[in-house]
Curated annotation (Swiss-Prot):
Disordered: annotated segments: 70-91, 218-324
Annotated organism of origin: Mus musculus (Mouse)
PANTHER family, per the entry: DNAJ HOMOLOG SUBFAMILY B MEMBER 2 (PTHR45168:SF1)
Every J domain range: 3-69
Phosphoserine modification, residue list: 311
Disulfide cross-links: none
Annotated ranges, domain UIM: 207-226, 250-269
Compositional bias (Basic and acidic residues): 314-324
Gene3D superfamilies: 6.10.140.100, DnaJ domain (1.10.287.110)
Pfam families assigned: DnaJ (PF00226)
Subunit structure: Interacts with HSP70 (HSPA1A or HSPA1B). Interacts with HSPA8/Hsc70. Interacts with PSMA3 and most probably with the whole proteasomal complex.
Record-listed Cysteine methyl ester modification sites: 321
Gene name in the database record: Dnajb2
Protein name: DnaJ homolog subfamily B member 2
Keywords carried by this UniProt record: Acetylation, Chaperone, Cytoplasm, Endoplasmic reticulum, Lipoprotein, Membrane, Methylation, Nucleus, Phosphoprotein, Prenylation, Repeat, Ubl conjugation
Length: 324
């Protein structure tokens, strides 16, 4: 069993007010009615919290506990002397009350959940200025600095349905490193995630390190799309588009010019495009290489302009007609 200070999550130097605040928080957290899905475990924790509060809230019991431990209260071990127990004898032991009795005595007949607001000083003025949240379903959250560290908490209750969820986040700075601890309490199960400088280091379930849960959480975070800081958009790297080789482009241009030249010859000779002027050109030794020597500006010159430049003169037309 953990020490009473660890159960209430307070230091050994905690004041009586700190003990009360810690019990109020833990008692509401582990109340069996708030943990119907894990009632057996919640009852155990609820009992430990009540026992720790009953001892640490009593000055005399706390002194004996600090000196002898729990054995000094139950009669096990050496135990306190007669003077320390008020002359009750060496066999004297303290009798712990039921956790339900401690809970009723602490909260009284009022709404126990309304007491949770007392833990958050930032809400004290709000409670006096407006109506309190007393409905069956309500949620609230807080965020406040604690010395040089930071912490935030959020709680949600549904008393009728027995649903309870709390999330608390605390950040501390140790030797220049930022340690963030996130505690999630839901249906009697406590999940603790510890991050160091933004990197998840451990995940614990009900106080037990869980490597499987750690691996699943790391995998889930890695699958999330990366977002450019300050931009809010996904980072996309441009991909280079492949272009056709230059010689392929020049061959296409040569082919277009050759076709234009053949058409111009046909029009000049008064023939239809279906004629075989192209074949006659090759028979008269008209080399195709002539077209490649042309200084063509790619797509910046029109095909018709080139065809006009290449149209034969009247003398050439007459000689060709004579040959035909």
């Amino acid at each position: 069993m953990a020490s009473y200070y660890e159960i209430l999550d307070v230091p050994r130097s905690a004041s009586p007010d700190d003990i009360k605040k810690a019990y109020r928080k833990k008692a509401l957290q582990w109340h069996p009615d708030k943990n119907p899905d894990n009632k057996e475990f919640a009852e155990k924790k609820f009992k430990e919290v009540a026992e720790a509060y009953e001892v640490l809230s009593d000055k005399h019991k706390r002194e004996i506990y600090d000196r002898y431990g729990r054995e000094g209260l139950t009669g096990a071990g050496s135990g306190p002397s007669r003077s320390e127990t008020g002359g009750a004898g060496p066999g004297f032991t303290f009798t712990f009350r039921s956790p339900e009795e401690v809970f009723r005595e602490f909260f009284g007949s009022g709404d126990p959940f309304s007491e949770l607001f007392d833990d958050l000083g930032v809400f004290s003025e709000l409670q006096n200025q407006g109506p309190r949240l007393t409905g069956p379903f309500f949620t609230f959250s807080s965020s406040f600095p604690a010395n040089s560290d930071f912490s935030s908490s959020s709680f949600s209750f549904s008393p009728g349905a027995g649903a309870f969820r709390s999330v608390s986040t605390s950040t501390t700075f140790v030797q220049g490193r930022r340690i963030t601890t996130r505690r999630i309490m839901e249906n009697g199960q406590e999940r603790v995630e510890v991050e160091e400088d933004g990197q998840l280091k451990s995940v614990s379930i009900n106080g037990v390190p869980d490597d499987l849960a750690l691996g699943l959480e790391l995998s889930r975070r890695e699958q999330q799309p990366s977002v450019a800081p300050g931009l809010g958009v996904m980072q996309v790297r441009p991909t280079s588009l492949s272009r056709p080789p230059d010689h392929d482009l020049s061959e296409d241009e040569d082919l277009q010019l050759a076709m234009a030249y053949s058409l111009s010859e046909m029009e000049a000779a008064g023939q239809k495009p279906a004629g075989g002027r192209g074949a006659q050109q090759r028979q008269h030794g008209q080399p195709k290489a002539q077209h490649r020597d042309l200084d063509v500006g790619g797509t910046h010159k029109s095909v018709r302009g080139e065809a006009a430049k290449l149209s034969p003169s009247s003398e050439e037309k007459a000689s060709r007609c004579h040959i035909l």
